[in-house]
Amino acid sequence: MQKIKISPSILAADFSNLGLEIKKLKKAGADLIHVDVMDGHFVPNLTIGPPIIKSLRKYTRIPFDVHLMISPVHKYIKSYADAGADIITIHPEATNNLKKSVKLI
């Protein structure tokens, strides 16, 4: 039987203390850490940018599952990958060239 992987989101975490929140997820046995990225355009809220992803790396090697809810998504894929995203999820409607965006991932 295949092991189910747990990927808790940090969206409801205390953003003023993300390092501690990441440590809690590590201690709890999270397999991945889900990071919702919102740009205030594609979706109405604003959240985490690449510098935050990069700074969180010092707290864990748990893979970051980064969900990009931003548009145009292709402009930012490389920045998030370079910052430490291990898995990147995009919305097809967030790009005018899905093939190009997938290739960037």
Region roles according to the model:
Residues 1-89, 93-100, 104:
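Conserved N-terminal beta1-alpha1 strand-loop-helix module at the mouth
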